[in-house]
UniProtKB/Swiss-Prot annotation:
Family recorded in the similarity comment: Belongs to the RRF family.
Domain of life: Bacteria
GO CC aspect terms: cytoplasm
Biological process terms in GO annotation: translational termination
Annotated protein name in UniProt: Ribosome-recycling factor
Protein species of origin: Treponema denticola (strain ATCC 35405 / DSM 14222 / CIP 103919 / JCM 8153 / KCTC 15104)
Compartmental location: Cytoplasm
Summary of the function given for this chain in its UniProt record: Responsible for the release of ribosomes from messenger RNA at the termination of protein biosynthesis. May increase the efficiency of translation by recycling ribosomes from one round of translation to another.
Length: 185
């Protein structure tokens, strides 16, 4: 029973780190990346569709993204969606493809992005700690109900803390790599 609680908390912590990495992929670092466009949705055919399902997104150069829609009639809608995504880029529509030059980041913008990355990472750390707290609360409830012993509760608390420390260390490592990526471009 307590193993199920531990496993559940471990999975939630793992998902938190995965979500952090996905969110970091959305931060523009001055280098072209197709991940910047993963969350963009385009209004077409009466519904909102992910951009990557409507077009081929390629990176021919370090600071250039080319979006080649499978249906050329969607060029204007895709261009509009990219502008609305607030990525601080200006798409150029040549009638066949959309080219997006990724401008180099200014020093101020780099600092802002690094600050934003720290905030995102801190939110992930808080989330991991909350998962630990919930797991410990659940274990205490099991002990109170007589389903586990006090020794098992102490062992579970230690396991939750160990998992928390490991996932926070991973969050810190991911943050450090992202900050380095932001500051070196």
């Amino acid at each position: 029973m307590i193993e199920e609680v531990k496993k559940n908390c471990e999975e939630k912590m793992k998902k938190t780190v995965v979500a952090l990495k996905e969110e970091f992929n959305m931060l523009r670092t001055g280098r072209a990346s197709s991940a910047l466009f993963d969350k963009i949705r385009v209004n077409c055919y009466g519904e909102s569709t992910p951009l990557n399902q409507l077009a081929n997104i390629s990176i021919p150069e370090a600071r250039l993204v080319v979006i080649q829609p499978w249906d050329k009639g969607l060029l204007v809608e895709i261009e509009k969606a990219v502008l609305q995504a607030d990525l601080s880029v200006n798409p150029t529509n040549d009638g066949k493809v959309i080219r997006i030059a990724i401008p180099p980041l200014t020093e101020d913008r780099r600092k802002d992005l690094a600050k934003k990355a720290k905030t995102i990472a801190e939110n992930s750390r808080v989330s991991v700690r909350n998962i630990r707290r919930d797991g410990i609360d659940e274990a205490k409830k099991l002990q109170k109900d007589g389903k586990i012993s006090e020794d098992q509760l102490k062992t579970a608390e230690d396991a939750f803390q160990k998992s928390t420390d490991a996932y926070i260390a991973e969050i810190n490592k991911v943050l450090e790599a992202k900050e380095k990526e932001i500051m070196e471009n």
